[in-house]
Amino acid sequence: MAVGIFDSGLGGLTVLEAAQKRLPEVEFLYYADSAHAPYGVRTPDDIFQLTRAAVHDLWNRGCDLVILACNTASAAALRRMQEEGVPPGKRVLGVFVPLIEALTERQWGDNSPPREVEVKNVALFATPATVASRAFQRELAFRAIGVDVEAQACGGVVDAIEEGDLILAEALVRSHVDALKRKMPYPQAAILGCTHYPLMEPIFQDALGPDVRVFSQGNLVADSLADYLERHPNMRGSGAAGYLTTGKPATVSNRATQFLRRQITFAAA
C-alpha cells in the first residue's frame, strides 16, 4: 500500500524523506515529472494540465491519496482539481496547508473569522509562478488579519538545485534574500515556499539572520500527513512503493542520489 507524492522534479524528495522518517510503516510512490520541469516558469493552465495527468496516473497505480509536494502545482492546480471533482475514494492534498497552519496556529478546518496572529511581517520565497498566483496570500487572508507578506520570486534556484550546482544555488539565494530585504528590511518570519528550498535552508537562515524564524515544509507536511492518515487509515491505497519519472531514469537517479546523499533509483513512468 502506498501514498503518492508528486513533484515536477526532485524538490518533493525533501517532503518524502521527512514523511518516511515520520511514518516508517507507510510506503510511498514518488512521481517526478522531470520531462516538464521546472513548473515555476509555466502558465497556470499548463501547470494544471500536467499536474492533473500525473495525479490521475498515480490514482490509476493504486495511490488513493496523492500529495502535491510542489507549491507551484498546489497554487495553480489543487483548487481547480477539487472544483472539477475528485473520483470517489480518491484524495489530492497540497503542501500549502501545513504552512498556513503553522504560521497562523490554527487548524485547516477552523472556519472562524480571520484573527490577528503574532507574526506581522512575513517574507515569502517561491517560484515565479507561485508568487504570481498569490495563492499563499489568499489562503492566509482567510485565517489571519494584519499580516504583511512580501513575496520574492526566486528565479533560477530550482534549476541550479536540479542541475546539482549548489554553489550557484547559494549565490542566487543570497541575491534573492538581499532583494527581499530591500523591500522588507526586518521580516519576523520567512516561508520557504518551494519544496526544493529546504536543501538551502541554512543559507536562507544565514542570509536572513538569526532573529528570523524560517518555516520549511518537510516536517510540517509529514506531521500533517501522519494526522490525516490517523483519521483516514483507509487512504493508504493499494499501490506499490517506488520512484517514477517522466524524464531519463538514469539521469534523474544520479541527481536524486546526489540530492539526498543516498542511492535512489528511478524507473520510467
UniProtKB/Swiss-Prot annotation:
Pathway recorded for this protein: Cell wall biogenesis; peptidoglycan biosynthesis
Enzyme class: isomerase
Residues at the catalytic site: C70, C194
GO biological process terms on file: cell wall organization; peptidoglycan biosynthetic process; regulation of cell shape
UniProt GO molecular function: glutamate racemase activity
Binding site for substrate: D7, S8, Y39, G40, N71, T72, T195, H196
This protein's UniProt keywords: Cell shape, Cell wall biogenesis/degradation, Isomerase, Peptidoglycan synthesis
Catalysed reactions, semicolon-separated: L-glutamate = D-glutamate
Keyword Isomerase on entry: yes
Chain's role: Provides the (R)-glutamate required for cell wall biosynthesis.
PANTHER family: GLUTAMATE RACEMASE
Family: Belongs to the aspartate/glutamate racemases family.
The protein, known as: Glutamate racemase
